[in-house]
Curated annotation (Swiss-Prot):
It is found in: Cytoplasm. GO terms for molecular function: ribosomal small subunit binding. PROSITE patterns: RBFA (PS01319). The keyword Cytoplasm applies. The keyword Manganese does not apply. Keywords: Cytoplasm, Ribosome biogenesis. Belongs to the RbfA family. This is Ribosome-binding factor A. One of several proteins that assist in the late maturation steps of the functional core of the 30S ribosomal subunit. Associates with free 30S ribosomal subunits (but not with 30S subunits that are part of 70S ribosomes or polysomes). Required for efficient processing of 16S rRNA. May interact with the 5'-terminal helix region of 16S rRNA. One of its GO terms (biological process) is maturation of SSU-rRNA.
């Protein structure tokens, strides 16, 4: 039962954090990013926010520094938007699955091109 609630809250947090980052965080270091997933512990005390950033390594690094600095602001905004007793501690992590999927896709295309 708790697991289903954690998934529902995670989906809502994903939408709210995207809105906060896009519309409220004014740090110019925040690049174009997409939140791919939010994983919550069953007690909703910690949340891992997985995201991808469009850009080179320096832009990715700058975006993570800006998000780390804005974590308190994002938490306070979440507190006013969501009805939770305790707002989870946020941890931002880079989601490499998109890059990995693109790499696999390129390899498959190369194999098909070599077969012809």
């Amino acid at each position: 039962m708790n697991n289903i609630r954690a998934e529902r809250v995670g989906e809502q947090m994903k939408q709210e954090i995207m809105d906060i980052v896009n519309n409220k965080v004014k740090d110019p270091r925040v690049g174009f990013l997409t939140i791919t997933d939010v994983e919550l512990t069953n007690d909703l005390s910690q949340a891992k926010v997985y995201l991808t950033v469009l850009g080179n390594d320096k832009e990715v690094d700058n975006t993570f520094k800006a998000l780390h600095k804005a974590t308190g602001f994002i938490k306070s905004e979440l507190g006013s938007r969501m009805r939770l007793r305790i707002i989870p501690e946020l941890t931002f992590e880079y989601d490499e699955s998109i890059e990995y999927g693109n790499k696999i896709e390129r390899m498959i295309q190369e194999l098909h091109k070599n077969d012809k």
